[in-house]
């Protein structure tokens, strides 16, 4: 069940809010109008207002949704785009299928039923299926900011989930009583998306853009499952998508290569041409960060649901192979103080370049 509520439609083709940059240098000037201080304040405010957790069914979850809506209206004061609040009933049958299929593919037949790994993942699978059933009365809410371009038929999509989940690393069970600030997971992605709205709302674009704040990521990616299905039904000509997940974790201490600024973009071989263009645009804006191209797929974020519906794209994230710190992942330690603020801001600049370069066909 989907209920679309259009809160504001103020886009008119004859309105001009600012010049459209025609070069990378001009683009950088516009991108830098959002400061590092602005970006970090979004994370601090979101974590504070939604404390102790943004998990489905808890008060902080609804507060996070309202925070995002209020922030969009504040950044797009002139209504250059429209806000679509897409409320949906979670497809718990799909959640059960998702977890069972994952277990069947990776565990069943590969381990004896008495093996500890089999037992661990069997319990997890059963538990998550039960969790989906337990939470099914809580509607999900995807928030979409859409701004039309000169060629409105072509659409670029940027996504980031805003809910959190806290899992015990040993039992893999959800601990709802534990605080889960979710600064990196995924207030970082939300903050970059809101900053992109701040940027894009003031520039005339060649193509339409959707910036999407996804719900229900923590349970079978049901928010992106719903969004991707609706996007497919719409018949839009989608250029591709950028999924933003955990952009603030970057250390030299834990990094196997002892470097910072080495982030990753995960995609499939068929996404390479689209992702390569994004990387080219982004790298023209800043050299303080690099998103290494990794055509290995990615199973830990909402990109999988968009891939299921045939869309091209990838997930921009931290370096999961060389600088993944489990101490902060889905734990109470995931606080704003643990983030690398310089890397996060550089990620915003880079992604701003990737997005604007695509939407404006920048070549020089």
Predicted regions and their residues:
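A non-catalytic alpha/beta surface segment that caps or lines the substrate-entry region
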Residues: 45-48, 52-146
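Extracytoplasmic/secreted proteins, especially bacterial periplasmic and envelope-associated proteins
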Residues: 26, 34, 38-45, 59-71, ...
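Structural recognition of the beta-strand scaffold that forms the well-ordered cores
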Residues: 144-146, 155-159, 210-213, 238-245, ...
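Second-shell loop/turn segments in exported
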Residues: 25-33, 49-60, 129-134, 175-186, ...
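Solvent-exposed loop/turn segments at secondary-structure junctions
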Residues: 52-53, 89-91, 149-152, 162-166, ...
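Acidic/histidine-rich catalytic neighborhood of metal-dependent amide-processing enzymes
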Residues: 139, 166, 177-269, 299
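Catalytic-core environment of secreted peptidases
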Residues: 33-49, 71, 75, 141-206, ...
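Active-site-adjacent substrate-binding region
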Residues: 252-364
């Amino acid at each position: 069940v989907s209920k679309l509520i259009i809160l504001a439609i103020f886009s008119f083709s004859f309105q001009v809010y600012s010049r459209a940059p025609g070069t990378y240098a001009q683009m950088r000037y516009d991108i830098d109008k959002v400061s590092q201080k602005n970006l970090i304040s979004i994370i601090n405010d979101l974590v504070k207002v939604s404390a102790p957790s943004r998990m489905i069914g808890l008060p902080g979850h609804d507060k996070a949704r309202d925070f995002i809506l209020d922030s969009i209206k504040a950044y797009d004061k002139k209504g250059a785009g429209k806000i679509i609040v897409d409320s949906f009933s979670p497809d718990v049958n799909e959640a059960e299928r998702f977890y069972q299929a994952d277990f069947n593919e990776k565990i069943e037949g590969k381990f004896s039923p008495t093996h500890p790994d089999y037992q661990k993942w069997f319990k997890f699978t059963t538990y998550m299926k039960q969790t989906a059933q337990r939470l099914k009365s809580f509607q999900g809410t995807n928030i979409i900011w859409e701004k039309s371009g000169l060629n409105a038929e072509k659409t670029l999509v940027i996504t980031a989930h805003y809910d959190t989940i806290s899992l015990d690393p040993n039992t893999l069970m959800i601990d709802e009583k534990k605080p889960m600030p979710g600064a990196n997971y995924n207030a970082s992605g939300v903050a970059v998306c809101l900053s992109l709205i701040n940027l894009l709302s003031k520039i005339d674009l060649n193509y339409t853009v959707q910036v999407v704040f996804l719900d229900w990521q923590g349970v079978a990616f049901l928010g992106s499952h719903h969004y991707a299905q609706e996007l497919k039904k719409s018949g839009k000509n989608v250029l591709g998508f950028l999924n933003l997940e955990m952009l603030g974790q970057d250390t030299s201490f834990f990094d196997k290569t002892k470097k910072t600024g080495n982030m990753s973009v995960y995609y499939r071989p068929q996404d390479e041409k689209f992702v390569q263009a994004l990387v080219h645009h982004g790298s023209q804006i800043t050299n303080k960060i690099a998103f290494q191209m990794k055509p290995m797929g990615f199973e830990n974020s909402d990109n999988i649901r968009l891939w299921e519906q045939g869309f091209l794209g990838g997930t921009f994230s931290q370096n999961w192979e060389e600088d993944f710190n489990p101490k902060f992942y889905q734990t109470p330690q995931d606080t704003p103080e643990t983030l690398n603020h310089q890397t996060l801001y550089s990620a915003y600049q880079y992604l701003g370049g990737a997005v604007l370069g695509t939407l404006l066909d920048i070549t020089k």
